[in-house]
A protein has these predicted regions:
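Substrate-positioning beta->alpha
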Residues: 141-161, 171, 182
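Amphipathic terminal alpha-helices
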Residues: 246-265
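Glycine-/Pro-rich loop/turn segments that contact NAD(P) or position catalytic residues
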Residues: 59-140, 147
Length: 265
């Protein structure tokens, strides 16, 4: 049995589907929605589904640092006899943009662990979907700064491999797409796929910050804007890890869009 936290999100949902297709007994966990309802900020709510679990996928929300303690959740996993944990972290930990406290809790747990460090998500483009549907317009900061956006499906498939195969124990994987792409280029890809013109507006950092603060804590907003606007070389580099684990190249932004074009029509 494999337990998936954050099971309703852009990574959790395809991860549940991938594992189920592989014949695994999957227990989806989220703060609301289908499956077992639990909150990592209240680790005891997770305990009822851990008996007999061979692995757990841990996904924390952006505000988790202010609300919870991952060491406490890891303690519940350890007490429940869970042997393996896979943590969805961030490329920003490796480039010292984000704190390593969650990774430290996992690597010091005494469990088998694998850490996934994805870069910019292709699915962040969902944030433009409503304005594209209703106004054929989108806005983004740093219009011509390119990052190798990763398809959440690739993250899910790498996570599935790590959850099932102990050969991935004590590994840290940086997950990116196959090529860097800027917001302006993403807009062009969406426009071409829809077959209709899309008006692109470049936001200032201050404008983007004001919007992001409505759904993300300030430290996360600032570090995210730093990555988007002034990425370090490592943050713009294409990682070989998706292909290393899956035996195939990572999906392109166009691949992701093709599967999700309905959201933009």
């Amino acid at each position: 049995m494999i337990v998936i936290t954050g099971a309703t999100g852009n990574v959790g949902r395809p991860l549940v589907q991938t594992l189920s297709a592989l014949g695994e007994d999957v227990v989806p966990v989220s703060r609301s929605g289908a499956g077992h309802q639990a909150d990592l900020t209240q680790p005891e709510t997770l305990r009822p589904v851990l008996h007999g679990a061979k692995a757990v996928f841990l996904l924390t929300s952006p505000d988790f640092l202010a609300r919870g303690n991952l060491q406490e959740a890891i303690g519940v996993l350890r007490e429940s006899g869970v042997p393996r944990v896979v943590l969805l972290s961030s490329q920003g930990v490796g480039t010292h943009r984000h704190p390593s406290i969650h990774e430290d809790a996992v690597t010091g747990s005494g469990l088998e662990w694998t850490i996934l460090r994805p870069g910019n998500f292709a699915s962040n483009a969902f944030g433009w979907a409503e304005s594209i549907r209703t106004q054929r317009a989108m806005a983004a900061p740093f219009a011509d700064v390119a990052l190798p956006a990763v398809d959440p499906q690739d993250i899910a498939e790498v996570a599935a491999a790590a959850l099932r195969d102990p050969a991935h124990a004590n590994a840290i994987y940086t997950l990116t797409g196959p090529a860097a792409i800027s917001p302006r280029q993403q807009a062009q890809v969406i426009q071409d796929a829809l077959g209709t013109a899309i008006q692109f507006t470049e936001l200032t950092r201050a404008q983007a910050r004001a919007t992001m603060l409505t759904f993300m804590p300030e430290p996360v907003v600032e570090s995210t804007l730093d990555i988007l606007g002034t990425p370090r070389p490592a943050e713009q580099a294409v990682s070989p890890d998706v292909e290393k684990v899956l035996g195939r190249p990572p999906h392109t932004f166009t691949d992701w869009l093709t599967r999700n074009l309905h959201a933009f029509r």
